[in-house]
């Protein structure tokens, strides 16, 4: 007499969730619409980030798509003005959502926070390939002003496994970057405050903000 197959467990243990770095896809429609759409995407991303942090967990792949739609506040100065016609509700919503420190940082970023298009980033990686950079687990790449990490969203396949590092001054932006790239080593602080050893990176690339502000660096 044949034995019956064993019954599967009533509540099989779910597969453990392993956080992975976000990968850009045109299917996600990350950068649609005008100023109001960008504002709404930013707000949803911030609310998602704060919920994730309150629950002390890592973003799911679906939440990463929401977070990746955060484009910062460049060109959205109206959201920070109580006198901008048509932006009254957005102004109130933003004041209520952000802490005082987050709000001030976001308002300051309206003239500097413009993120780099993925296609432009791909051209920069092609230049790296022509220079002979091969990547690998013993190689290190740094983005010193990474924003939410667009440069790592289109990292070429041959560079997967390369150690990734990033620095971002803005708190909200840097915390989103950490959720999007949990496999990277990201510091949320001013670049002058990060303690990297000299000559410790194989590649430094990015599109950092340009300004005439002088920064104090205790080492120099």
Specify the residue positions occupied by each region the protein language model found.
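Class I S-adenosyl-L-methionine-dependent methyltransferase catalytic core
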Residues: 1-220
């Amino acid at each position: 007499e044949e034995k019956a197959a064993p019954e599967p467990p009533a509540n099989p243990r779910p597969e453990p969730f392993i956080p992975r770095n976000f990968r850009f896809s045109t299917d996600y429609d990350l950068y649609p619409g005008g100023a109001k759409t960008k504002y709404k995407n930013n707000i949803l991303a911030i609310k998602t980030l704060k919920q994730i942090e309150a629950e002390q967990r890592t973003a799911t792949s679906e939440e990463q798509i929401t977070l990746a739609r955060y484009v910062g506040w460049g060109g959205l100065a109206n959201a920070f003005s109580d006198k901008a016609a048509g932006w009254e509700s957005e102004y109130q919503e933003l004041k209520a959502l952000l802490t005082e420190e987050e709000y001030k940082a976001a308002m300051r970023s309206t003239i500097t926070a413009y993120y780099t298009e993925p296609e432009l980033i791909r051209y920069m990686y092609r230049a790296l390939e022509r220079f002979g950079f091969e990547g690998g687990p013993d190689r290190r790449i740094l983005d010193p002003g990474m924003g939410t990490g667009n440069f790592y969203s289109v990292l070429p396949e041959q560079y997967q496994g390369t150690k990734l590092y990033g620095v971002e001054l803005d708190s909200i932006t840097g915390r989103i970057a950490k959720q999007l790239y949990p496999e990277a080593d990201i510091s949320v602080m001013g670049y002058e405050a990060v303690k990297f050893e000299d000559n410790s990176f194989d590649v430094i690339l990015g599109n950092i903000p340009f300004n005439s502000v002088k920064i104090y660096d205790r080492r120099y």
